[in-house]
């Protein structure tokens, strides 16, 4: 936790609302398949188990145009408030495609990301259904098979950049960061997908991606 705190400050991020608690750091236990491919084994919530943002934290968060979170961020109950404040919520569902979660979360989301093992014939139907709950964009990533975005009118696909892979930790997070950056600067869908693929390609070449 302390290392991440220092890293945030190194990148000149505002840490005034970062809560520091005694206890274990929230982590995912992971394994590497074939020496390079990350596999999530278990979420250990640590201090995040009891995390609750203060009212000052919430008001501070609402000053931003974009908010990124996920199912473990413990702010799902705040999504309606964030949307009402005009914030665009970027939501990482990871591998979770539970319909109950989608119905509860997606009405308040601007762009949703889903991690899929393979690009199956059913994926387009899934993205159409996910978008029917309300988000502007829904994106699926397929590892080495690239990515796909649906905006309600068309499906756009993007391949990966072929680079030497050290490990895939951070590949998904960096793809989301690149795609979101594209949204922020006004890229079209193709441009956003390319931004995601380019940043992800940089990250998978590093052993210490963060």
Go through each PLM region and give its residues.
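Structural motif
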Residues: 65-66, 111
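Glycosyltransferases and closely related glycan-assembly transferases
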Residues: 61-63, 76-89
